[in-house]
Amino acid sequence: MIDLSPLVRRLAGTPLASWSQGLQAQLDAKLEKGHGDLDRWRGALEALPALQPSEVDLVNGLRLDCDCDDATRAQMRQALMGLSPWRKGPFDLFGVHVDTEWRSDWKWSRVGPHLDLKGKRVLDVGCGNGYYQWRMLGAGADMVVGVDPNWLFFCQFQAVQQYLPELPAWHLPFALEDLPANLEGFDTVFSMGVFYHRRSPIEHLLALKDCLVKGGELVLETLVIEGDENQVLVPEDRYAQMRNVWYLPSVPALARWLRRAGFSDVRCVDVSVTSVEEQRSTDWMRYQSLSDFLDPNDHSKTVEGLPAPRRATLLARK
């Protein structure tokens, strides 16, 4: 059982206090329903060696270390491998380098300098395995709640969290839709790599706005195309082999959508073409990756002949 009482205590006296009261029952109900692989992943978590980190670095990456022998490291590696595939990272855990599919540290180095998270209550929507949650704490956030309904990501978060039990980061296996309307309790809300999977993009923006306090900041990172405010790509079928991609707006179009959704002070702080060095197959994620989804003769296009992945980060104020 995962005990959420520290989260409830943390949220006492905040606008999120009443929401927090029902979280334990909501989580227990989700765990009761479970997932077919949950027992196997729990076995991997139980196989992790009991270690106490003497070094913790969440500022320059995600690194935990202490004195431990090769046998303990081998045990650590085997247990973590049992939670593959690892998508977001990398993690350096007691001498084991988890070389994830994504170099998420590169994205954080592009996004992080534009943010002031000091003392902020943060929500990370579609948080994956929680890599960015730890980096947000490293950037001074007061606390970070992540929501993502993927059970493997939930277990990967637990693998790191069991070595950092005192830190104010929580991963809830919920979708954004599981959060109540008009929550209005977070200073900063992140939606990174989620927007293009949504069939109703404006509804997603409104739901994110609902989570923010008045004057709070949205950090929106998503796939975009080049063009003016009237340019939006809706793939006929797949995009980079993904079926569930709906809307790829231009940056000016996305900025307009944010303003229509009631946000102000909208600004784009980064646009980057995703490279095959930033997203690739590794020992920790052995399935196909970006190089398999691009035209082998022209990396400016996907295998479907559409513009290759280009990602933008926009900030906006409620």
UniProtKB/Swiss-Prot annotation:
Coiled-coil regions listed in the entry: none
InterPro entries for the chain: CmoB, Mo5U34_MeTrfas-like, SAM-dependent_MTases_sf
EC nos: 2.5.1.-
Pfam families referenced in this protein's UniProt entry, alphabetically: Methyltransf_9 (PF08003)
Any one GO BP annotation for this protein: tRNA wobble uridine modification
Alphabetical list of SUPFAM superfamilies matching this protein: S-adenosyl-L-methionine-dependent methyltransferases
Keywords: Transferase, tRNA processing
Catalytic activity, reaction form: carboxy-S-adenosyl-L-methionine + 5-hydroxyuridine(34) in tRNA = 5-carboxymethoxyuridine(34) in tRNA + S-adenosyl-L-homocysteine + H(+)
Residues engaged in binding carboxy-S-adenosyl-L-methionine: K88, W102, K107, G126, L176, E177, M192, Y196, R311
GO molecular function, one term: methyltransferase activity
Function noted in UniProt: Catalyzes carboxymethyl transfer from carboxy-S-adenosyl-L-methionine (Cx-SAM) to 5-hydroxyuridine (ho5U) to form 5-carboxymethoxyuridine (cmo5U) at position 34 in tRNAs.
Entry similarity comment: Belongs to the class I-like SAM-binding methyltransferase superfamily. CmoB family.
Subunit: Homotetramer.
PANTHER family reported in the protein's UniProt record: METHYLTRANSFERASE, TRNA U34 CARBOXYMETHYLTRANSFERASE
NCBIfam families given in the database record: PRK15068.1, tRNA 5-methoxyuridine(34)/uridine 5-oxyacetic acid(34) synthase CmoB
Protein name: tRNA U34 carboxymethyltransferase
Gene responsible for this protein: cmoB
